Amino acid sequence: MASTEGANNMPKQVEVRMHDSHLSSEEPKHRNLGMRMCDKLGKNLLLSLTVFGVILGAVCGGLLRLAAPIHPDVVMLIAFPGDILMRMLKMLILPLIISSLITGLSGLDAKASGRLGTRAMVYYMSTTIIAAVLGVILVLAIHPGNPKLKKQLGPGKKNDEVSSLDAFLDLIRNLFPENLVQACFQQIQTVTKKVLVAPPSEEANTTKAVISLLNETMNEAPEETKIVIKKGLEFKDGMNVLGLIGFFIAFGIAMGKMGEQAKLMVEFFNILNEIVMKLVIMIMWYSPLGIACLICGKIIAIKDLEVVARQLGMYMITVIVGLIIHGGIFLPLIYFVVTRKNPFSFFAGIFQAWITALGTASSAGTLPVTFRCLEDNLGIDKRVTRFVLPVGATINMDGTALYEAVAAIFIAQMNGVILDGGQIVTVSLTATLASIGAASIPSAGLVTMLLILTAVGLPTEDISLLVAVDWLLDRMRTSVNVVGDSFGAGIVYHLSKSELDTIDSQHRMHEDIEMTKTQSVYDDTKNHRESNSNQCVYAAHNSVVIDECKVTLAANGKSADCSVEEEPWKREK
């Protein structure tokens, strides 16, 4: 017994055979620094090319500005590859949003998707409010606006005032599109028109009255006529992203509740998502050239760059400093506090998405690249990214909120208007709410700025004075928006990881049960066939209804082979 126990306690030896491909040679410890740099560049070739494209575009644009005036056709040809890149990225937005939302939500139950959405919304609202407050603090501290600056820039263009109520109602209307196909390329907007209304005429001849009214209108409106503002709804060009997201969120949740019945549909959208991501990879290899051409063409097209830099330099510095503080300090700090992980290694994983946003100035256009960075580089669960990122690209606009808060108070300072505490709070809240609905409003930047200025009673015509530097600030705030979306996905994934693991274990348990049932049915069928293999069923003309058997005839002792395909039996002679 002792010897047996000793034998049992002996360590078991396991032989592991490895192929040569599994073995890697140990790198020498003392390697040339240049060789190590080349290795890193080779592993991150696409990222290196993208960064090189941004630098090349900026340098070439600056050098070409020093040359003789360039013909507009030449500028158009320089920017043409960038225009193609933007078209390709925007082409993938619709199928990517549809497939990602449906596949992400179909893998979650109703409770999990609700908690996921709640965490995402809390993060979005918190960071957007922080960004708006930060912008207000910086613009009040730096005070870039000066009444003398207004005289240098000259008068702006008159803009129609926009009602906050109309904008809010348009937001709700676009959330529930009446035609899903139309929502792919149009969205609804309230339009105000000024109409001259004549007083009731006592003349019997209506035609003469109308002609008289038209003649008076051509010259000068008489005192009796009144100007009446009439409102109406019109469809404007532009994808109704908010409406599409709302519908497909509901579609994905409903499909997830159907379980096995919707399995085929889930597989279809999973395949669609994989196809779109394959196309994204192909487009990303073209992006370095496209981004370089975009930046180069935009720099060349700017008029009076030096004059604009002198006049609006402090305004630009205020916005850029705010974006750097928010994107480089506040967002990483929030991520570290919640997850206790290194935010800079996280940022390294999304650097490709950040540089793409900097070049394209489009959160939605960068969405395919952001998906790839988070899922492939950082290993975030696809159920989180496919739900959080499309929603975040639509409503989470930290950079936009900061920019609009700074711009509104800058215009007030430029006009010599001193805002009280209530008006400053109004600017902060309006900037937050306007940035949330920016994606579903046509001409979003202009309209949302009009909302803020109208809310605090500032002149709306001064917005046109800021357009000269918007090309740069737009890229900066878009890159911060993408960084905010990415950190949000990482935070939501960290908070939801235990729930996702529980759902995975439930799915595995369900699959094991289904596999056991299938195996049981298979075993029963096999046993049934084996029990019937020794039996022969005689019918007319010696036909049988079994697969195959070999029997001995009692009449003459000869054997016979029988099968379903062969009847009557072939008797052996």
Swiss-Prot record:
Q: Where does this one sit in the cell? A: Cell membrane
In this UniProt entry, the residues modified to Phosphotyrosine are Y538
**Glycosylation site residues:** N205, N215
Region of interest called Disordered, as start-end residue ranges on this chain = 1-29
Q: What PROSITE patterns does the annotation carry?
A: NA_DICARBOXYL_SYMP_1 (PS00713), NA_DICARBOXYL_SYMP_2 (PS00714)
Task: Please report the organism this UniProt entry assigns to the protein.
Answer: Rattus norvegicus (Rat)
Tell me the InterPro entries matching this sequence: DAACS, Na-dicarboxylate_symporter, Na-dicarboxylate_symporter_CS, Na:dicarbo_symporter_sf
Q: What does this protein do?
A: Sodium-dependent, high-affinity amino acid transporter that mediates the uptake of L-glutamate and also L-aspartate and D-aspartate. Functions as a symporter that transports one amino acid molecule together with two or three Na(+) ions and one proton, in parallel with the counter-transport of one K(+) ion. Mediates Cl(-) flux that is not coupled to amino acid transport; this avoids the accumulation of negative charges due to aspartate and Na(+) symport. Essential for the rapid removal of released glutamate from the synaptic cleft, and for terminating the postsynaptic action of glutamate.
What is its quaternary makeup? Homotrimer. Interacts with AJUBA.
- Name the gene for this chain: Slc1a2
Q: What is this protein identified as?
A: Excitatory amino acid transporter 2
Which residues take part in binding Na(+) 2? T394
Q: Which PANTHER family match?
A: EXCITATORY AMINO ACID TRANSPORTER 2, SODIUM/DICARBOXYLATE SYMPORTER-RELATED
Q: Please, which domain of life does this record's source organism belong to?
A: Eukaryota
- Binding site residues for L-aspartate: A361, S362, S363, T400, I441, P442, S443, A444, G445, D474, N481
Residue numbers binding Na(+) 1 = G392, N396, N481, D485
Which residue stretches does the UniProt record annotate as biased composition, category Polar residues? 1-11
Lipid tethering residues (S-palmitoyl cysteine): C38
